[in-house]
Amino acid sequence: MTILNSLNQFSKGRLSWLLLLLFVVFFEACALYFQHVMMLAPCVMCIYERVAMMGVGVAAIVGLMAPNNPIFRWLGLIGWGLSSYKGLLLAQQHVDYQFNPSPFATCDLFVTFPSWRPLNQWAPWIFEAYGDCSKIVWQFLDLSMPQWLVVIFAGNLIALALIVI
């Protein structure tokens, strides 16, 4: 059995989806720690990236419900892929704001959610943005937070590709 077959079989069990969900919970907890304990103000792009990460979590829950059922498994895989791809695009745009600042290319001043789902009004402690997208407020191993998110979302897409192949 090849490693790709092993990964594919692993994705048909609950443990794989639980690990993905725990991965999301860990990174969301880190985001809230940075915001509420370290007092780092999240920007609009940070909030959108946070929502993309939550999309990965929702996909993990869908896959966790019935991993042997092809419909639930594929819905989970597709949701994981779409959320990771959108998160990667948002993180890359955020990196661009930080490393190529321009008065003509800036992020929005306020988060904009649909009127039927105003997350920033329902849970402002999680979804309200009041930081500057172009400001680098935290670094680890010489990478800013959006650069780490590029690594994380790209890693998700690579893991997904290895599982699906």
UniProtKB/Swiss-Prot annotation:
Report membrane topology: Multi-pass membrane protein
The answer, when asked if Protein biosynthesis is one of the entry's keywords, is: no
- Subcellular localization(s) per the UniProt record: Cell inner membrane
Q: Which InterPro entries match?
A: DiS_bond_form_DsbB/BdbC (IPR003752), Disulphide_bond_form_DsbB (IPR022920), DsbB (IPR050183), DsbB-like_sf (IPR023380)
Q: Which residues lie on this side of the membrane: Cytoplasmic?
A: 1-16, 68-74
Where does the source fall among the domains of life?
Bacteria
Which Gene Ontology terms cover its molecular function? protein-disulfide reductase activity
Location, primary (coarse class): membrane
Q: Name one GO biological process term.
A: protein folding
Q: Which residues lie on this side of the membrane: Periplasmic?
A: 34-51, 93-147
User: Which family does the record claim for this protein?
Assistant: Belongs to the DsbB family.
- NCBIfam families with a match to the protein in the record: PRK01749.1
What this protein is reported to do is described as: Required for disulfide bond formation in some periplasmic proteins. Acts by oxidizing the DsbA protein.
What the entry lists under HAMAP family is as follows: DsbB (MF_00286)
Name this protein carries in UniProt: Disulfide bond formation protein B
Q: Which organism is it from?
A: Vibrio alginolyticus
User: Gene encoding this chain?
Assistant: dsbB
